[in-house]
Amino acid sequence: IVELVLTDHPMECDSCEVNNNCELQTVANDLGISDHRYNSPKQHKGIPRDTSHDYMRMNLDNCINCGRCVRACDEIQGSFVLTMSGRGFESKITTDNDMMFGDSSCVSCGACAHTCPTDAISDVFQSKSAAVDKKVRTTCSYCGVGCNLEASIKDDKVVAIDTPKETEVNAGHTCIKGRYAFSFYDHPDRLKTPLIKRNGKFEEASWDEA
């Protein structure tokens, strides 16, 4: 079965964005499969890369039609943006009304990119493959839900956000703010010290005072 899946997937792992962090590559390596014995179909070859989305990229040349992105969009986010169109060798992932990804009704939660086993759908921050110094478990501060996040740190700055699947609060899911709006963490206008109003003016205070 894995060999058949690989007939429709480029065997160019070394140049792939998610090299060494690809579920398909991991399964193939575990089974000792580095090539396939079948003629390669052409249903996913030569499809233009869709870079119209602000946060995600769609590269259907690397899609294996597993359908996980469709289920994540439907069952986790409830947006129903992605679907499997066509039949047989003509099957492929499309957005609503076959629009460009950036023109679709996508709410940018990133669930599709997070669950994709290859880099058919990935985000612009390369959250699945970024070379980082460390990863730190934290809690999103945008709202009161308290989604558990994993921040990828490089040179003391957050460069990507992941959502661990085993977390109880959000079970590996979050919204656009939690996943992609992390630039505010280092924004110069962000309040990092408690303020107390004294004599009509806000003054910095200690955490104990606050």
Task: Spell out what each predicted region is.
Residues 2-8, 17-210:
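N-terminal export/assembly segments and adjacent metallocofactor-ligating motifs
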